[in-house]
Amino acid sequence: MSKDNKNIVITSAVRTAIGTFRGSLKDMQASDLGALITKAAMEKSNLNSNDVDELIMGQVLTGTAGQNPARQAAIQAGISIEKTAYVINQVCGSGLRSVAAGYQAIMSNDSKIIIA
């Protein structure tokens, strides 16, 4: 590591419930679940929604979710419409890739606070 690396920390960990295909969560939209966990992550970290620079959400089955479910979740969670949000679909690796993308955005000075 170079001498000018930043100290980047994960301040909380929250995830959606794990369900089964066509199970008890089938009537919930991914954006609604995303909004719930985004609010929970902000609460656990004592973050104001205005502090968040970007939301990166891992989602695999996006077929009926509408345009950019991460953006929908961010807006529902109270994150400003001026902030960015996007979905990563990398099957089983979507969540981990979201965290890695958040780290990269912070390291490159594109963002300071990311929810992934």
Segments the model singles out, each with a brief description of its role:
Residues Q90-A116:
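Active-site-proximal alpha-helical scaffold in enzymes
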